[in-house]
């Protein structure tokens, strides 16, 4: 099952499991922020591929999911 980035950020935010999320796409950091920041700023087309956790920081790799409707 694919999970998009805003959904994951919301889950982490509700469980109070992290202080920071570091979001990477193709080995490039594209966003660093609190789970709340990421929830409001991230796009649903960003799909989580891998997750690493250390010291209340999640390192999340994402890919861009292209949509049929072009949006």
Predicted features along the sequence, with ranges:
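N-terminal acidic leader/helix
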Residues: 2-26
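Acidic, low-complexity, intrinsically disordered interaction modules
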Residues: 17-64, 68
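Short intrinsically disordered terminal tails
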Residues: 1-3, 64-71
């Amino acid at each position: 099952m694919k999970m998009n980035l805003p959904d994951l950020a919301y889950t982490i935010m509700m469980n109070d499991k992290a202080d920071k999320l570091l979001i990477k796409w193709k080995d490039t950091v594209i966003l660093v922020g609190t789970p709340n920041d990421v929830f409001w700023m991230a796009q649903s087309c960003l799909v989580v591929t891998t997750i690493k956790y250390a010291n209340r920081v999640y390192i999340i790799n994402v890919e861009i999911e292209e949509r049929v409707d072009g949006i």
